[in-house]
């Protein structure tokens, strides 16, 4: 049952992203898509954290921080891009964020291509 609820959540997020991409198309900076996605998430009442900072540790020493674009309903990490094409480094970044934030599922959403590109990410154990 939990998987079904989670799928409903990811479909809602993807639906919001599709609305933004259908309205704006590609060619804008990532921050523009972030701001528009906020508007769409607010319209449907999804709770989210934006640009939530997380410390990164190595050998129990903090070596830096990272910021995920969105954490939605404390269940789905969403990383946005505005690139012509997603590369392996973007997938690796999303997977690393899932580990750092200890979140099981994520979405990598690329607004930069002619068609919206969405990759589902799952944390490795």
Regions found by a protein language model. Name each.
Residues 1-45, 116, 122-125:
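Solvent-exposed, charged helical/coil patches
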Residues 25, 68-86, 97:
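Conserved catalytic cores of phosphodiester-cleaving nucleases, focusing on short active-site segments
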Residues 28, 42-43, 62, 91-94, ...:
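Nucleic-acid endonuclease domains
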Residues 44-60:
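A short acidic/basic microdomain associated with nuclease active sites
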Residues 46, 61, 75-76, 114:
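Well-ordered beta-strand scaffold positions
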Residues 49, 69-71, 110:
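Well-ordered beta-strand positions
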Residues 81-125:
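Nucleic-acid nuclease catalytic cores
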């Amino acid at each position: 049952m939990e998987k079904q609820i989670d799928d409903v959540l990811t479909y809602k997020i993807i639906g919001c992203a599709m609305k933004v991409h259908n309205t704006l198309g590609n060619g804008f900076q990532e921050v523009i898509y972030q701001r528009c996605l906020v508007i769409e998430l607010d319209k449907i009442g999804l709770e989210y954290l934006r640009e939530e900072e997380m410390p990164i540790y190595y050998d129990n020493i903090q070596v830096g921080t990272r910021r995920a674009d969105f954490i939605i309903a404390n269940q789905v990490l969403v990383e946005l891009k505005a690139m012509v094409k997603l590369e392996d480094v973007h997938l690796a970044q999303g997977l690393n964020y899932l580990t750092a934030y200890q979140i099981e599922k994520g979405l990598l959403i690329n607004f930069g291509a002619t068609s919206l590109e969405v990759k589902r990410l799952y944390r490795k154990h």
